[in-house]
């Protein structure tokens, strides 16, 4: 009786699905004057490479940019032209006046799903999609240090070509911690 009721409530939609990960060519844009001018080493990119290659993605390109929105936009456009179907931007994601990555992503896509997520670590996460549906993510610094962040919650969906909405991100806030 309970199983019949469960079937009735579920309707024709599956209760859950297992979707395959799609092959992604990933472009990484590292921003920040400190890295661009060689004052500090880029320690973020190796972390990102490890995370995305776990899903079978390949790194198609990596650009290092100064804190200049036009330079960041050019790097994103260049990676898209080179065939990248996912762009990950590191650096410049906080609220400092010289953090220009969110502006550059907005200018490229015009379609920011969310700048900010109700999940810690990762509150300054940004998700956007290009007009043809390619995801561009702005990753906060915590992704470099914390074992699990909002990026680790979103990445499997993106790798399976499941569009992530603002409502999806809001639902991840139940509990608020990764």
Regions found by a protein language model. Name each.
Residues 1-60:
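Short, glycine/charged-enriched hinge/interface segments at domain edges or termini
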Residues 33, 43, 57-178:
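Short glycine/threonine-rich loop/turn motifs
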């Amino acid at each position: 009786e309970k199983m019949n009721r469960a079937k009735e409530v579920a309707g024709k939609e599956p209760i859950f699905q297992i979707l395959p990960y799609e092959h992604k060519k990933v472009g990484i844009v590292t921003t920040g004057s400190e890295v661009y001018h060689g004052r500090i080493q880029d320690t973020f990119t190796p972390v990102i490479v490890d995370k995305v290659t776990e899903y079978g993605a390949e790194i198609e390109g990596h650009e290092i940019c100064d804190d200049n929105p036009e330079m960041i936009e050019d790097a994103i456009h260049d990676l898209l032209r080179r065939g990248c179907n996912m762009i990950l931007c590191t650096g410049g994601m906080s609220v400092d006046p010289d953090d220009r990555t969110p502006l550059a992503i907005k200018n490229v896509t015009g379609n920011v799903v969310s700048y900010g997520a109700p999940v810690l670590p990762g509150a300054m996460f940004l998700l956007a999609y290009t007009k043809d549906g390619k995801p561009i993510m702005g990753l906060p610094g915590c992704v470099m240090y914390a074992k699990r962040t909002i990026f680790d919650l979103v990445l499997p969906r993106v790798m399976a070509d499941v569009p992530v909405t603002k409502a999806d991100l809001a639902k991840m806030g139940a509990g608020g911690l990764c």
